Amino acid sequence: MIKPTVIKIGGATLGSHDTALADIVEIQKRGIPLVVVHGGAKVVTRWLERQSISTRFIDGERVTDESALEMVAAVLGGLVNKEIVAAINDLGGEAVGISGIDGALIQSRIRNRKMGYTGNVVRVNTGILDTLLSSGYLPVISPISSHTLDRPEDTPPMLNINGDTVAGEIA
């Protein structure tokens, strides 16, 4: 199998005049294997504000406390991921939305305590990607990971990961 091209898109791609999704569909139709990793920081921030959950950033990355982590997982793993998958499928592509948790795709550990539940990628298990790609599907990945390595019992089973980092690690 040919190594897939990994494309990182922002959540802002939806509803804009950006042609990225149409371009992705065109590439998939040519038989070139692709993996899409998406972000969605602005959408997450909007939802956090709606829930009156304060958010702060250090060096451009979200500090993720437990309340924010729940919202990040819901918004990125649910809303943003499914909107991107629906848009790609509406354009004639064949996309499947997953998160880094699914199939133990991304395993990580907490980067440092000041960032809260934000992690560093430790391992990428591409088995689920290989399965989807060999069946002709375009995996669309939200940057949430399994927090399985060195996880203290009192911490959540998932972590927020920067989408650019996830894309780089998968590539």
Where are these regions (language model features)?
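Nucleotide/pyrophosphate-binding catalytic subdomain
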Residues: M1-I170
